[in-house]
Amino acid sequence: VRAREGRAIKIEGNPQHPVNRGKLCPRGLTSVQGLYNPDRIQAPRKAAGRGSGNFIDIPWDEALSTASNLLGGDPAGVAFLLGYQPDHLYDLVKEITAAMGAPAPVRYGALGMFEARATLIEATRQTTGTAGLPFFDLGSADVVFSFGANFLETWLSPLAYSRGYGNLRQGKLGKRGYLVSFEARQSVTSGVADEWIPVIPGSEGLVAKAIGRLAAQINGGTIPTAFADLDLAQAVQQSGVSEEKLHHLAELFAQAQQPLAIPGGAALGHVNGLASAKAILALNALKGAASAWLAAEDDSAGSLASVVALVNRMKSGEIHTLFIHGVNPVFELPAALGFSDAMKNVKAVVSFSSFPDETALLSDWILPDHTGLESFGYQRV
């Protein structure tokens, strides 16, 4: 962070950071705007009637005393809905809820849902025994099969994967890397791929199994259990990918020195998402791909099911106090879930938003938190 007279003026990448290597994505570059945004809430506010849009400023002592009193009620009726804020804050809230006997915090973020983080973590847990987000080293591979992972746009860490894509194309293994993208739509990643395979949504797992089975046969090895139950004719019919194309892709994967298969995004967001993720991850075991490795163990990625359960508890009146931090559920959640209507059955709603977003305007209190440039914590890597 470049500062002048104690004021942040620009954010740049750290050349020594293993992820960005001195670069930064547009979202990071513009984050300084949140610090000086004229609409930023400067002090705690109390609603003059929920939903009225009218608030009065209150002292921090009164705000903190109110929050403390709200936590003193029946712990079973206290709920925390968090976004994808830094891990230190999630860990702190998790410890607080455990100590007071309240339900564990629910985590949600629209972007995380689009990325299918929870599905990928669960597939990794069932495949490797460790719940964590895998990192895929594109730069160390020579052939990459991307199933729905639009890593050149917003998927997980677009900056790190863009750098990896550049290394893939430069040919670390002596030849230019080859990219095949399996997506129903032609995203940015599919647009620059050597081959774009427009599969029928929900059939990505069958395609991965077909490629795995055929690649194992080409290599002359035993067919792994993950691919043993495949019906090739069924895979062709349900995926829309011809048998000839599947044989071509299997040969490409089998002959690669360091192939890599990446599950994510759209492939995991459709029906059979978990099964597809497991089948795609299993492709990496065919030749012992070293280009995929696990980040720190992490089970904190929220699922839509946990949010639905929370909304149902709100509707039934089980929740008397709701704390919301780092997420705007009134805007981000599908309207069909009825989150804003469910809020009417909650006695007290506290938002920690720094801006008057849709959820904050329907809350009883707004206790604005620091921005990332004003706080310090940790992130598991």
Placement of each model-derived feature along the sequence:
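Conserved thiamine diphosphate
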Residues: V192, Q217, I223-S239
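A glycine-rich, hydrophobic/aromatic-adjacent loop/helix-cap motif
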Residues: F253-H320
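Conserved short loop/turn motifs at secondary-structure junctions
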Residues: G77-P86, Q237-Q238, G264-H270, E297-S300, ...
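Short, polar loop motifs at secondary-structure junctions
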Residues: F182-S187, F352-E358
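Flexible glycine/proline-rich, aromatic-decorated loop/lid segments
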Residues: V188, D357-V381
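N-terminal export/assembly segments and adjacent metallocofactor-ligating motifs
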Residues: V1-G220, S242-H248, H325, I366
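A short, gly/pro- and small-residue-rich
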Residues: T154-K175, A279-A282, P334-V349
